[in-house]
Regions:
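Catalytic-core regions of core metabolic enzymes
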Residues: 1-274
Length: 274
């Protein structure tokens, strides 16, 4: 992943243009954009292609970043997959459940690493890789891997990690929609032996069981922060995936995690990570 070229799907839109420009200035190797209506034009001195296939064939890109409206995402993502893209980072939010189930099916079938939807993306400071919308003001090279479902809390953790001179080795927003595409085992096959990472901070919340996949992991030191302890039952809090219910009660989750790892009472305790 660290040396692959990147296709920006949605580069020609205002949102995609803005964040693609920031990523390029940061040092990310984005080489092309995608828009069949504007094929042959240049944006940020990058060629715009009519299809993922042409972009992959000509530029040899293996990663795509998705900035397009949610109702177009399914077709573009499946086109990415068939064209040979291996890693897809989806910033778009509110992809329908039906579309996400189809996307997950194709990602599993073709062994694709999919991050999102409704994700701030991924940033790797040492390699100057920014795939998404992360603010770079507080990004500094360090040894803390921040893994989060909440974009806003990720940004706060980044700011506090800089303040406490921890820095970041890698920051990942897994996505806030009800169905996310991330395969944890596949993601860690790429990054678990990432030498720059000393500690992992997992920012969990209500409405998710993804934290449970880390309970018996021992290769790196892991710390948790779980938000939403006072949230009411059966109420969406913040985004569509954050729902506290009797099948995934947050207090039961915290009790289970405490058996294995330290849980921070709030993110200001990030200075406990050493």
């Amino acid at each position: 992943m660290l040396n692959n070229k990147i296709l920006s799907c949605g580069l020609t839109g205002n949102f995609g243009f803005f964040h693609t420009k920031i990523s390029i200035l940061y040092g990310t190797n984005i080489v092309s954009g995608l828009n069949y209506k504007k094929k042959g034009s240049l944006y940020l001195n990058l060629p715009i292609f009519s299809s993922s296939y042409k972009s992959v064939k000509i530029t040899k890109c293996k990663i795509s970043i998705i900035f397009i409206p949610s109702y177009f995402c399914k077709n573009i993502i499946i086109e990415n997959i068939y064209s040979g893209i291996k890693i897809i980072v989806c910033i778009s939010e509110d992809i329908t459940l039906y579309d996400m189930l189809k996307i997950k099916f194709f990602c599993n079938k073709y062994n694709i690493l999919f991050i999102g939807p409704n994700s701030p993306g991924i940033i790797i400071p040492f390699y100057k890789i920014r795939l998404g919308i992360f603010p770079i003001k507080n990004i500094i090279i360090g040894n803390l891997f921040i893994f989060s479902r909440s974009g806003t809390l990720t940004y706060k953790a980044i700011k506090l990690s800089r303040k406490n001179k921890l820095g970041q080795s890698l920051c990942l927003g897994i996505g806030g929609d009800i169905i996310i595409g991330l395969n944890i085992k596949k993601f860690f096959s790429y990054f678990i032996n990432f030498n720059l990472t000393k500690n992992i901070l997992i920012i969990g919340e209500i409405g998710s069981t993804i934290e449970n996949q880390f309970l018996k992991y021992k290769k790196k030191k892991i710390f948790f922060f779980i938000s939403g302890i006072f949230s009411p039952l059966k109420t969406t809090m913040g985004h569509s995936g954050a729902i506290n219910n009797k099948f995934n009660d947050i207090l039961k989750k915290i009790k289970k995690i405490k058996k294995y790892f330290l849980i921070l009472n709030n993110l200001n305790e990030i200075n406990l990570i050493k």
